[in-house]
Amino acid sequence: MQDSLFQRPVDRKRWQALYDRTEQPLESQHIWYLHTVLTQCFLPYKDPKVDTWERRNGDFSIALVSGHVRDPRSDTLTRRIGLPYGPKPRLFQSYISMKAVKNQSAVIPIENSMTEMMRMLGLSVTGGKHGTINSFKEQISRFVACHFTIIGPGPKGSYSHVKTTPVKRFDVFFPTDSRQGTLWPCEIQLTADYFESLKEHAVPFDFRALKPIQAVARSIDIYLWLTQRLPRLDKPLLLRWPVLHEMFGGALGLKDFRKRFPHHLRAAHLSYPDARIDQHSEGYMFRASPPPVPRTLVAVK
């Protein structure tokens, strides 16, 4: 990407300083995975305040339906909890995907407490009604309760629809001592269909590269899309503004999106410095680039 894209020098200095902290040889513990569809069709950026939601990117689509939950401290019936949104469920789904792929098991051990999980993901940990612990708990609960339909090309021009709830079992319990943090179980279990699909379609990436952008969902999505798309290009790919808007715009109008997208792309590019990207009068040109994770280090080939 040309230096002229860095319109404000402070941006480049900030992002480069954050990324420089991770400049050490790539090792297996740095490699995480995500289902390829989730690197092309993304969760909402903000709370859509609806119970159904769909995002499309070319031949692939993902449709979400809010799941039902019940708080054991309440006598009320189950209720729809809402759809996951923002950066936190993106980080969590990457974590459970990484564990499943590396261990080759649908049963995934997780950290003993929510705060340990958050620190492992690089998130700040604050308590209170408006603290990060409560928001993290809510987003992960929304994600694990959500029903997914993954849609992609099928045989003879058809489209295949795979309905799945990625997590088969996930229990959160609430201690009677209010001074004790909300605890997590020692493991979760993915559904068989989702696990098999993940093994076949896992995209590797360097988790350290997410650290500078982990609080910005749109930059995370752009980075993950770049990591799976650019190494597979055999010729330059021009994406015009309407297509980019459909992919990454979310609820933004096209005009606002065109103002904001360059900043998010700069951030993602600094986390993937080998990505070859050029400005174009109608959008951006993407070119074949070295993968951020060499094939020799990939757990599933």
Q: Model-flagged regions — what are they?
A:
Residues M1-K301:
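Charged, alpha-helix-forming regions
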